[in-house]
Amino acid sequence: MTTPKPMLLIPVENQVRELDPKLLLACVAGRRGFSSVIGSRREMEMRIDHFPRSIYLSKSMTVRSLLFFWVAAKFGHDIITWDEEALVHLPPEIYFSRRLNPAAIRYVTHLFAWGEENAELWRRYPHLPPAIPIHVTGNPRSDMLRPELHAYYADETEAIRREFGRFILVTTTFNHVNACGPDMNLFKP
């Protein structure tokens, strides 16, 4: 008899941006024998003591994560992490100071990188625990762009095409240079 795999806890903070990719992750995990719970990050963190020992997927390792990581570890949960902001990032020293906390990262058992460049960035972090494995896996947000998944959004895509015709979308909301308030821009002209 095999030991059952632990449950995977997949929190969602921004439903529009995160829910579909995390559903994809839960499906892939399910094929590999993992049960998953997907829910509001806030609610999941407030009720972490109600879950059996599980694997909690965090999207960051900032100082704000520290208290929750400590509590989750006290209840026997493993914490695995990717960084949602690591695909395109600030220079390493600034990235390290804003996105990684030396105390928080000590609670993390596995890191999942967007790609080799992300993994290399983490390897250069001076406070990286030496035994922490870094897995280059990509990210389900980018997986949603794969051709075999285009049908998932086919109805929405067709409705947009009917309404607007052919167009080019230029995204201009980059938080470092065009934040919602000018005082929040990291770089100023």
Each model region followed by its residue ranges:
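Phosphate-coordination loops involved in phosphoryl transfer and adenosine-cofactor binding
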Residues: P4-K5, G165
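A solvent-exposed, charged loop/short amphipathic helix patch at secondary-structure junctions
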Residues: G181-P189
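Active-site and donor-binding regions of nucleotide-sugar-utilizing enzymes
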Residues: P6-A159, V170-N178
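Charged active-site motifs of nucleotide-sugar-dependent glycosyltransferases
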Residues: E163-L169, C180-G181
